[in-house]
């Protein structure tokens, strides 16, 4: 881990990327919290990946643990969504607020404000960046978070659990995006 980003930050863009990560993925982490960031490289163009990520009202399009989502009001900054979680996880619902949606910089920020789970004071930032993978348009996705460490758990246990969820979401995002990109190429 370099500057809290798995896989390092200097690989794509050098110092510019390090500065970008420090600017957009810096979370104020209190004593009882943990924070981390993960990187996923996707073999699909940015516009396609962003079209999935930006849909605050439809996280189930790529998040495998979401069965249903209801947005209260229009999907704009400050909007709330009620997410139903599939069985098998230690939760059934999560109430989340859209904190940031920047279509020019490709930044999405979400804060969990309720639900029947242990992710208290959870806040995440997801950014999407163009890159070239194997000579084609690709996308680098960075997702960072901060969350309270539940009583009875360690920082390492909490980070491990949240990182596992994010890895699943990012893998699914890559699978869906790459499938859609291959359909675009063949059509």
UniProtKB/Swiss-Prot annotation:
The positions annotated as site (Involved in ABA binding) read 64, 110, 162, 165
Annotated residues for binding of abscisate: 63, 91-96, 118-124, 143
The short motif Latch loop is annotated over: 117-119
Tell me the Pfam families matching this sequence: Polyketide_cyc2
Give its localization: Cytoplasm; Nucleus; Cell membrane
Q: In which tissues is it expressed?
A: Expressed in root tips, vascular tissues, stomata, flowers, pollen tubes and developing seeds.
Q: Biological process GO annotation list?
A: abscisic acid-activated signaling pathway
- What GO molecular functions are on record for this protein? abscisic acid binding; protein homodimerization activity; protein phosphatase inhibitor activity; signaling receptor activity
The disulfide bridges present are: 29-159, 34-159
Map motif Gate loop onto the chain.
87-91
Family the entry assigns? Belongs to the PYR/PYL/RCAR abscisic acid intracellular receptor family.
- Protein's UniProt name: Abscisic acid receptor PYL9
This chain is encoded by the gene named PYL9
């Amino acid at each position: 881990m370099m500057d809290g980003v798995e896989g390092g930050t200097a690989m794509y863009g050098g110092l510019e990327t390090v500065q970008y990560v420090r600017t957009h993925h810096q979370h104020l982490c209190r004593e009882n919290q943990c924070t981390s960031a993960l990187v996923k490289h996707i073999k699909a163009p940015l516009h396609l990946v962003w079209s999935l990520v930006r849909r605050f009202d439809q996280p189930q399009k790529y998040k495998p643990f979401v069965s249903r989502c209801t947005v209260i009001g229009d999907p704009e900054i400050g909007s709330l969504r009620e997410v139903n979680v599939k069985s098998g996880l230690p939760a059934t619902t999560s109430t989340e607020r859209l904190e940031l949606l920047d279509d020019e910089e490709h930044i999405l920020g979400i804060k969990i404000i309720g639900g029947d789970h242990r992710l208290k004071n959870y806040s995440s930032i997801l950014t999407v960046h163009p890159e070239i993978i194997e000579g084609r348009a690709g996308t680098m996705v960075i997702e960072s978070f901060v969350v309270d460490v539940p009583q009875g758990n360690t920082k390492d246990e909490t980070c491990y659990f949240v990182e596992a969820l994010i890895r699943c979401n990012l893998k699914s995002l890559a699978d869906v995006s790459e499938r859609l990109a291959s359909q675009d190429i063949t059509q």
